[in-house]
Amino acid sequence: MIKTPKLNVIENLVKQVNPYVITDELIIPVWRKRDGVHIAPNEYSFNPGGEAELSLGDTWETGYDMTSWFSAKVIVPEEMDGKKLYLRLDFGGEALVRINGAIKGAVSSRMNSGWVHRDIIHLDNPARKGTVYNIELEATVNSGGFCDAAMAGAKTVFYTLNTA
């Protein structure tokens, strides 16, 4: 507890917190997924069968030499115009995140207890209504959670689309 009789000190503390408060949230409930193999930089071989559609809460499987690509499109709604935008993503393992084709960062899952957890990607700010974000995650098995499973003999592991 802060022990100060000065009201302006508390008011200043509140002002410092306000920019970090989430005021609006836009859930991305459905993602397209396709699987394949990363061969070399910008060279991929995709599995036959096309894309699958996954929703938050669904599980997906990956293993050695497998790469999964998740994609979704978001259009900034009017009520988010002028605000700071962030993506909060937790798909299970680790993933490289591209926005409109450009690498913006990487995320790693909270489900891998003991390993680094990163789930925030900063977008261009301030947001402008109508702006389109094409989001793509390139997820592979190089995550700590899979290493633990592989050491125990697993060839594949299941992850969950937790947050988007």
Task: Show which residues each predicted segment covers.
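Glycine-centered loop/turn motifs
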Residues: 57, 65, 128-132
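Beta-strand-rich ligand-recognition modules
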Residues: 96-152
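Short beta-strands within extracellular/lumenal beta-sheet-rich domains
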Residues: 60-78
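Intrinsic-disorder/low-complexity, polar/charged segments enriched in Ser/Thr/Lys/Arg/Asp/Glu/Gln
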Residues: 67-73, 84-86, 132-134
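Catalytic-loop region of hydrolases
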Residues: 36-59
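An acidic-aromatic loop/edge-strand motif
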Residues: 2-33, 135-164
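A structural detector for beta-sheet-dominated domains
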Residues: 47, 55-57, 77, 88-90, ...
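Aromatic-lined ligand-binding clefts that engage carbohydrates, nucleic acids, or primary amines
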Residues: 81-99
